Amino acid sequence: KRNHLRRGGFAGLRETRLVMSPRIFRGQLEAGTLPGIGKCAYLADACFLPHGDTRMHEHKEVDVISIMVDGRIHHEGSLEDGQELEVDDVQVQRAGGEGFSHNEINPDDSKNRMIQIWMIPEVAGEPASYQMFKAQDGTRTRVYGGPPEQTDTIPARTVIEVTHVAEGDTVEQPGSSLAYMTLGA
């Protein structure tokens, strides 16, 4: 389905938007996109043009999860300015009630690839925060969600995990889940 959706974007970013919640994107929905999945308000498979950037922009009351699939990103902004993201890095930014401003920049001469997910926080008005994770081979790394008493990730009922699965291996998930594969079948 991803390859049949319109490729859009802005500034130096091109993306295929799979989820666009009308709660955030009033009047901007694109044909074929889902209008949200639970607290998931946005899901995009994006690439930055060589030396492309998003320009400085703001977020408020949204949790932004960025997963680097290919290439690198240089992060500028009010949270962890100067951070570099490489393949398998996962950046989790909570805008909360105070919000944050940021710009993502491709420092390289070639395109890169990133998955971005926006989640609506379960509790409004939380303070802004920033976390970094690294996806591991053969192991699930929780990058978002979990009970309120834990502090390893932003607490939420929706859990987001990332992993690498070697060719020929399988992953079993009890209960219902949604998976997004960046390569393979």
Predicted region positions:
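"Short basic amphipathic alpha-helical interaction patches in structured regions
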Residues: 79-86, 105-108, 130-134
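Short beta-strand segments
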Residues: 43-44, 68, 94, 118
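Ligand-binding loop in jelly-roll beta-barrel domains
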Residues: 95-125
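Glycine- and acidic-residue-biased ligand/ion/polar-headgroup-sensing regions
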Residues: 60-79, 87-90, 167-169, 173-185
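Histidine-centered metal-chelating micro-motifs
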Residues: 54-55, 72-74, 91-92, 96-105
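Hydrophobic transmembrane alpha-helices and immediately adjacent juxtamembrane helices
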Residues: 1-7
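C-terminal, non-catalytic macromolecule-binding modules
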Residues: 124-127, 138
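A short glycine-rich, His/Asp/Glu-containing loop-to-beta-strand
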Residues: 13-63, 114, 131-172
